[in-house]
């Protein structure tokens, strides 16, 4: 295995054509982003549409010190825009209307479709008009519990079109967890599908939503309208399974509406709601160490800049590339790097519904070959699971289109890194091992494909505008080599602004331990070459397959059993799922 000193240089062909083609160029741009953030991000902001111009005197203000007053971050304050306009109308005006926005690849290889930017805009406007017809307006919260289908992207962007705040919940969460999140954000509308196949497993999404809405009603909150996509009848069921599930979808009169009954006849024109840069865009729940989920709140202008810029540089995206992120849209990776970041760059992406193992264990590599994918972004858990199979499952496919391989969710172990680099990338691809969180909105520590010499397992260096610091237990900064708490001393545009309806908890969780710093809850160490290595959580959180769960959350479930009076949960390493 490589030692900590082992360095892999970017392939000459990757570096030669990269947006950032040397480490010296990275360092120069990074320094500019720290010394002159207004100038650095202001130049990037010019690529986007602002209905109200940007006031450069109020471009960027913040306070990270609880001793000096309330914690806040503001970027481009006073400027107005609409993200769906920037992702769709702007790209169409720039000549990309007929470009493929998404290749949709279903759970079964016989199911696939595609959607252009022009068609995506039409469908977004249709559904936005339907939402408006049901009284959904600017600032209202909309809960989304959807599989990886095109309507999920349409629903997200329809919310942003009219200024509604979307709250996605991964369609694997229980009705209990979902209802807790619906009640917390007081969602007026819910969007789901009748059901979905994941591999050979059937998930009755609408039934789970019904249970969740019942629980909400018992707790005094009624969801006013539930839109249901009829998905099952248009897809191929796993062989040997009869797909008559759609007949069983229960619909409640006056509340539940089939998508196909209202969307096709709606108008394809919907004027965008111009939002303040600091208006809420979406909220996404993440586990809290006390057990109650935290509604992480992201806002409009800064998030747009950061999603767009990290996507462009970290994946070195070029106009004719095909990009594929395997993450579910229910997680932050799906928000930033399946929906917002790619579309902000007029990218063509693959949207994949299934698992890595269906119908065979080489499905990922078959999809890469089918669409000639250039950038592939997945989790170490998936890589470790796929490593267990024979190499021929990878080598039988033509993966020569690949240029950048990404990793997300947890630090990648060196064994998995080497397998990914050698077997999947043929020692020609750059690996970007990205560290970030739901709270950060986008990558904060990452190599850049053409610029950063790679160390297997290292998160490497900060992205533009990000200033990492290592602190010891007493809050003293660790210079040079050393290990400590990973904190950040200033905000970047894509950072969370608050926890929904709970700013006190926001300040306590992230800013009280070390006044003046955003505390990630992770530890890290800096090696002799200045590379940062994330060492894992330093709070009461478990990292399971790249997803955070609190020990308190698991303990509370265990103690619900009448045979359990006390429960304590500790992490245990797992060869595939991590620790």
Predicted regions and their residues:
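AMP-binding/adenylate-forming catalytic core of the ANL superfamily
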Residues: 169-195, 209, 369, 376, ...
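Conserved AMP-binding/adenylation subdomain of ANL enzymes
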Residues: 302-322, 332-375, 388-392
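Conserved pre-ATP/AMP-binding loop-to-beta segment of ANL
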Residues: 98-100, 224-231, 242-243, 250-285, ...
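Conserved AMP-binding/adenylate-forming core of the ANL superfamily
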Residues: 84-85, 98, 102-157, 174-179, ...
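Conserved ATP/PPi-binding loop(s) of AMP-dependent carboxylate-activating enzymes
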Residues: 461-465, 476-510, 547-549
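Structural core segment of the AMP-binding/adenylate-forming
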Residues: 157, 161-261, 379-380
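Gly/Ser/Thr-rich phosphate-binding loop
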Residues: 260, 347, 374-378, 387-454, ...
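Conserved AMP-binding A3 loop
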Residues: 113-118, 273-274, 281-305
């Amino acid at each position: 295995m490589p030692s900590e000193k082992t360095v892999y240089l970017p392939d000459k062909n990757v570096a030669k054509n990269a947006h950032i083609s040397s480490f010296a160029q990275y360092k120069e741009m990074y320094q500019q982003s720290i010394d002159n953030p207004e100038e650095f991000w202001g130049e990037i902001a010019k690529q986007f549409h602002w209905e109200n111009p940007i006031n450069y005197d109020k471009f960027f203000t913040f306070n990270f010190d609880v001793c000096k007053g309330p914690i806040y971050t503001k970027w481009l304050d006073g400027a107005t825009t609409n993200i769906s306009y920037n992702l769709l109308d702007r790209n169409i005006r720039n000549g990309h209307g007929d470009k493929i926005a998404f290749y949709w690849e279903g759970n079964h290889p016989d199911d696939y479709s595609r959607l252009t930017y022009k068609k995506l805009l039409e469908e977004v406007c249709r559904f936005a008009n339907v939402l408006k017809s049901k009284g959904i307006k600017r600032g209202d919260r909309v809960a989304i519990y959807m599989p990886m289908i095109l309507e999920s992207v349409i629903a997200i962007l329809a919310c942003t079109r009219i200024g509604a705040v979307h709250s996605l919940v991964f369609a694997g969460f229980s009705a209990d967890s979902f209802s807790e999140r619906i009640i917390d954000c007081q969602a007026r509308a819910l969007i789901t599908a009748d059901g979905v196949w994941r591999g050979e497993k059937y998930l009755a999404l609408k039934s789970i939503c019904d249970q969740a809405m019942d629980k909400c009603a018992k707790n005094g909150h009624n969801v006013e309208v539930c839109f249901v996509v009829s998905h099952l009848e248009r897809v191929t069921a796993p062989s040997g399974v009869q797909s008559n599930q759609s007949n069983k979808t229960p619909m409640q009169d006056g509340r539940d509406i089939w998508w196909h009954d209202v969307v096709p006849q709606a108008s394809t024109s919907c004027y965008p709601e111009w939002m303040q840069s600091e208006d809420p865009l979406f909220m996404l729940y993440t586990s809290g160490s006390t057990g109650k989920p935290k509604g992480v709140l992201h806002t409009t202008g800064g998030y747009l800049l950061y999603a767009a810029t990290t996507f462009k540089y970290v994946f070195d995206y070029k106009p004719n590339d095909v990009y594929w992120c395997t993450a579910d849209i229910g997680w932050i990776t799906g928000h930033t790097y399946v929906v917002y970041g790619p579309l902000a760059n007029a990218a063509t992406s693959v949207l994949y519904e299934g698992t890595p193992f269906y119908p065979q264990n080489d499905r990922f590599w078959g999809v890469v070959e089918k669409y000639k994918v250039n950038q592939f972004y997945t989790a170490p858990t998936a890589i470790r699971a796929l490593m267990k199979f024979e190499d021929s499952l990878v080598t039988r496919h033509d993966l020569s289109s690949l240029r950048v391989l990404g990793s997300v969710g947890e630090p990648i172990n060196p064994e998995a890194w080497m397998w990914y680099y050698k077997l999947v990338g043929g020692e020609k691809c750059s690996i970007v091992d990205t560290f970030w969180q739901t709270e950060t909105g986008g990558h904060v520590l990452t190599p850049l494909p053409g610029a950063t010499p790679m160390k297997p397992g290292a998160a490497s260096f900060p992205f533009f505008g990000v200033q990492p610091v290592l602190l010891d237990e007493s809050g003293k900064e660790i210079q040079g080599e050393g290990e400590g708490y990973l904190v950040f001393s200033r905000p970047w545009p894509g950072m969370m602004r608050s926890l929904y309806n709970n700013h006190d908890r926001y300040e306590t969780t992230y800013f009280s331990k070390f006044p003046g710093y955003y505390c990630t809850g992770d530890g890290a160490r800096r090696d002799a070459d200045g590379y940062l290595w994330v060492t894992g959580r330093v709070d009461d959180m478990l990292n399971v397959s790249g997803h955070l769960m609190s020990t308190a959350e698991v303990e509370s479930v265990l103690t619900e059993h009448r045979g359990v009076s006390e429960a304590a949960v500790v992490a245990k390493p797992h060869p595939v799922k991590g620790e």
